[in-house]
Design a protein with these regions (language model features):
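Generic multipass alpha-helical transmembrane bundles of integral membrane proteins
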Residues: 105, 111-237
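N-terminal topogenic module of multi-pass integral membrane proteins
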Residues: 1-119, 227-280
Length: 280
């Protein structure tokens, strides 16, 4: 696979976390289908099964990129995303997959630099997603991500060009009838955004050197790239709120991923306190 692309990450069942995922997803499908049948949900049991599993998988995959050393966070995100899907109808996963690719672009979790077709494919996907969802700020986030990849360790300079393309399309969208900032954001939304920003800054500032390895080499992930990827994921979530308003909290599982990262961070901090050392 890596002979053709530097983007893909297969779910290798040799790893315990991947085996756990492959066991959990069918169970979630059955639960989603059962709940849809029990409560006579309009989309039906089959659609509910696939929707629930897709939301859970998307959240798991993104959180594995956001916090590669903490596999437990991914399963927290999986659980929250599935609950949000069943209880609140959080079925849209497009933004989650866009964020996943943007984060992977920056943190280089697969190892090698992107091939030209990888760049073109993700660039096109980001543009299409921004236009189809009418979220022009997504292009700003993508531009920052491409610029970071062209700047950080082992830079890929052609991504400056990809960033320029994103900015150009962003300006083109602004010239049309597109809303940049939603009108229904209230003080509480801004408080939550600020609180999440503070949490993400704390996570990045206190994170140790990564212990996870790249997929295709014996090299460990780069701390600056991992932290930059985390910030990119948060920016992707925030831009949806700014454009779509308060409804974006529950439209997509991306905030489940952010919450899972922060919960994982809080758990690590609590367990570092004197008297909280686990024995055995």
């Amino acid at each position: 696979m890596y002979r053709f692309t530097s983007i893909a990450r297969p779910i290798d069942p040799a790893y315990l976390t991947n085996r756990a995922l492959l066991m959990v997803l069918p169970l979630l499908m059955l639960l989603s289908a059962g709940l849809a049948s029990l409560y006579d949900i309009d989309k039906g049991p089959v659609a509910a099964a696939f929707s629930g599993a897709l939301a859970a998988f998307a959240a798991w995959a993104l959180t594995r990129e956001l916090a590669p050393d903490y596999s437990g966070a991914a399963f927290v995100a999986l659980s929250l995303a599935w609950i949000a899907n069943v209880a609140f109808g959080a079925t849209s996963v497009l933004l989650v997959f866009v964020a996943l690719l943007i984060v992977r672009l920056v943190n280089r979790s697969t190892g090698p630099r992107w091939r030209p077709l990888d760049t073109l494919g993700v660039l096109g996907f980001c543009i299409w997603s921004a236009v189809s969802t009418q979220q022009p700020l997504l292009l700003v986030v993508a531009a920052v991500a491409f610029s970071l990849d062209a700047t950080l360790k082992e830079p890929l300079r052609r991504h400056y060009f990809a960033a320029a393309v994103c900015v150009s399309v962003f300006i083109w969208m602004l010239l049309g009838d597109v809303r940049l900032i939603a009108a229904d954001l209230v003080a509480w939304d801004w408080v939550l955004i600020a609180a999440s920003a503070g949490g993400i800054i704390l996570v990045a500032a206190t994170s140790p050197e990564p212990v996870s390895y790249c997929d295709t080499s014996p090299d460990r992930l780069d701390r600056a790239r991992v932290n930059a990827g985390l910030v990119m994921g948060w920016l992707a979530a925030v831009q949806a709120l700014l454009t779509d308003g308060s409804a974006a909290w529950l439209e997509t599982p991306i905030w489940a991923c952010m919450i899972a990262v922060l919960v994982s961070f809080a758990d690590r901090i609590v367990n570092r306190w004197p008297g909280n050392t686990r024995v055995g």
